[in-house]
Amino acid sequence: VLNYDPANPSNWNADQDIKKSPLWPYCGNSVGIWKCPADRSTVRPSSGPFAGQVVPRVRSMAMSIWVGGWKQNNGLVTDAGCSGPTWRVYSKLSDMADPGPTRTWVLMDEREDRINYGNAFTDMIGYPDAPSQWRFHYDYPGSYHNRACGFSFADGHAEIKKWRDDRTCPPIVLGGAWNAVEYVPSPRNPDIFWMQERSTRKK
């Protein structure tokens, strides 16, 4: 998990998590692809070779929880607030019949003050026709690029999505997490709908 704890090597040591990932053999030995250059978050480790130094955190990317699921729960997404059992978790390309690989995002930039685990949770509650229920889970997309965020999709293409709603882009809280509330209501937010459309479908 990524945070600002100086005793947590996951913040600054790529050997801790990134290089243990099943995706690492496909990364060209490049740690840098896991962090957006616009994310300038840092941490001061309390131990190890960088103890006492200010060093950059290693990651700003997160993977859709609907692609691969939640490791700590045998791949299942069972959060009641996200109607977990109702929605598909894609474990291989052939699972992605709907919405299809070109419409299923896999990785995105996440905000430095909200990123935690390696997954990003798009809350599906209210999709598609109950917009008064739409909300963010703890995970928020990045907005570093002039209120836009980078997404990569299952077919290999990438998109920069320009956000339309101010609620998607609150000011960054430097050096810490803002608003520890797990769910943040954002009714009728078109940006949430855009992510829901490209996340999963009902079983």
What are these regions (language model features)?
Residues 1-203:
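Short, well-structured segments within or immediately adjacent to enzyme catalytic domains
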